[in-house]
From Swiss-Prot:
It holds the Pfam family MinE. This is Cell division topological specificity factor. Keywords: Cell cycle, Cell division. Prevents the cell division inhibition by proteins MinC and MinD at internal division sites while permitting inhibition at polar sites. This ensures cell division at the proper site by restricting the formation of a division septum at the midpoint of the long axis of the cell.
Amino acid sequence: MSLLEFFRPQKKTSASLAKERLQIIVAERRSQNDPAPSYLPQLKEDILKVISKYVAIDPAMVDLTFEHKDDDISVLELNVKLPDEEK
């Protein structure tokens, strides 16, 4: 390394620049703890419609939750309390 190379800024390759930007985006998303998808209320409503075709059910008896376990794992949990009697 010559003395001029030491003081001259080194050019970044497009690959290293893209990698750096991607790392920033990933870190930002991790810090935000991505909220649940926007379609969850509609999904719950659709599930209620399907269940109500077969069983009289109160909307409070259906619980739909979404959580992130890891960076690449998300869990959608559906709990339905069914009544003893059918329609």
